[in-house]
């Protein structure tokens, strides 16, 4: 009904039941509180604000901040029409970023980075945007306040932005800047632990982007990942554990530490109140490793042990789809 994609997603409605905005999970708690307060005080929904910008109208500062912190990745047609392609989305984000007043440095930089990241992931990006996006990226990397405001881009988008915006001979230096930013996030005790754990995953993807296709991280890099994952697993509390394990096993898998990823998931089965989630993850892991029979078995066990009517339908469909794909005979 509400087109929710990913948990947790907070959707703020007006008294008339119109969606004002949706706020992504994952940001640091202080910024989350400020964005939530901004949304609760908002009068106009994000969809209306976008239309106003498209019509050349002036927005209040609070409106721009609401646009900058909207969960665009979880929009699902609530603001942007589902029929528009990624190129059209990029042009929309570019319009928003360009129209945002320069005095609103944080909001403008966030909209610029959203546009640049969307552009970098296009199959055939319009190179007319390259110079401005590279300038914006350099500005963010050079400014600690802008980097902190664009935490998601620092963690997740370093590889794609570096590859799209720079010539191969220039990429190493910018990757090193991203590397230093990510390491600072991991070591920053003022940030929430889930954010710091996701930064480990971002570090892995950044290092892999410098390698030839199908190449693995070095032994020393894998050892570093193992140590950081062990630290993260030991640091989480019971309320954080399920989400943390979901992040950490995928980090191990991305780093080529498949046995460690499997062991983490198997251990999670013994402590989780919803082990079927991790059974499904084990199915995915074995599928990726080419162990089809084991994968189907885990998908089946996930379905058999799942609780709740909607969950059982979801896991049941997942089992059937994978059984047909992996064991067609």
Predicted regions: what is each one?
Residues 162, 207, 252, 286, ...:
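Residue at a conserved register position within TPR or TPR-like alpha-solenoid repeats
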Residues 54-58, 96-102, 137-147, 182-194, ...:
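Solenoid-like repeat scaffolds
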Residues 4-46:
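Non-catalytic, surface beta->alpha helical segment in thiol-disulfide oxidoreductase systems
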Residues 59-64, 105-115, 144-160, 189-208, ...:
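Generic helix N-cap/helix-start motif at coil->alpha-helix transitions
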Residues 124, 255, 289, 326-328:
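Structural motif corresponding to the intra-repeat A-B loop/turn of tetratricopeptide repeats
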Residues 31-90:
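Charged, amphipathic alpha-helical linkers/stalks
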